[in-house]
C-alpha cells in the first residue's frame, strides 16, 4: 500500500511539473509574440512595410491562428502592392475569427481603391454589422455604392456620416457627387453651398456648384458661379467653356463669344467650343465665320445630330447645297426623331430639285410635330382635376 501511494505521488509530481513547464512555455511564447507585435508596429509607424511583413510572418510562425496578425500581415502586403497575398491573408483572418472587423474592412477598402466597387460592398457592410461606428468603413461603403450606381443607398450612408460631422468637407463633396448623379440638383446646390462656405473652395467646386444651379434652372446664378471658377483657374479651357456655354444659353452672345474665343486660344481644337461659337455665329447670321468652326465640331463628333445639323444649315446658307443636303441627311440618320431635322432636310431637297423626297421629309416633320402636340395634350389632360 505504501509503495502504491509513493508511486501515485511520483506520478502527480511529474504531472504538476509538466503542467508548470507547459504554462511557462505558453507564457514565454506569449511574451515573444507581444514583443514581435511591438516591433512590427514600430516598423509600420516608420513606413518600413517590408520589415513589418517579416515580423508578422514570424509572429504567425509562433501563433498561426492569430487572426489579428493575419490582418496586419495583409496590411503590410497591401502597402507593398502585393494585393493577391494581402487578400489571402485577410481571408485567413476571416476564417479564423469571422467576428473580427479588421479583415473585412481592409478587404473592402482594397477593393474600393482598385475600383471593384460592387465586390467591396459586402465586406464593408459586414464590417459595419460588427462595428456600426466605424466611420472609415462607412465612407468606403458610400464610395462603393456610388461607384456601383446605387446612389440612394449611398446618400443614406453619407447622411449618417454628416449627422456626426456636418462640416466635413470631404463628406459634403461626396454628398454633392451622389446628388448630382441622381439629378437631385436642388439638394446638390445646398450641400455645395455648405462646402463653399468652408476653407479650400476650388475652381472645380465652383464649377460643380454652377452645374447644380443650372440643373436646378437657376442659370443666371450658375453663370456667376462659373465666373468665380474662371477667376480661380483662368487657364482651364474646361471651366472657361462652361462659362461661355452658360452665357450662350442666356443669350448673352457678346460675353459668350469672348469666353469661347479665349477657350479656342487656349485649345484651338476644342470641339465643344468650336460648335458653340459656330452655332452662335450662325444664329447671328455670320455664316462664313461659323463654317470652319462647325466643320471642326462635325469632324470631332460625326455621330451627333447637332453638329451635322448645324453644319448642314450653314452650308445651305453659304450656297453649298450639295454638301448641305449630305450633312442634313447625316443629321437625320443620327436621330430621325427630331422634327426640325426632317423639315430642314425637306426644304434643302426641294431647293436642289428633289421634289418627291423633299415632300416626304416635310410630311415626316409634320407627323412628328403632330405626335408631339398629341403627347403634350395628353399630359395636360392628365393634370386636369
Model-derived features with residue positions:
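Terminal, low-structured helical/coil segments at or just beyond the last alpha-helical repeat
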Residues: 23-24, 343-385
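TPR-adjacent "capping" and linker segments in tetratricopeptide-repeat scaffold/adaptor proteins
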Residues: 21-35, 196-197, 372, 382-384
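Structural signature of tandem alpha-helical TPR/SEL1-like repeats
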Residues: 45-58, 79-92, 113-126, 147-160, ...
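Helix-start (N-cap) detector for alpha-helical repeat units in TPR-like alpha-solenoids
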Residues: 33, 67-68, 101-102, 135-136, ...
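Alpha-helical segment of the N-proximal tetratricopeptide repeat
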Residues: 31-62, 75, 79, 177, ...
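Structural marker of alpha-solenoid helical repeat scaffolds
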Residues: 62, 96, 130, 163-165, ...
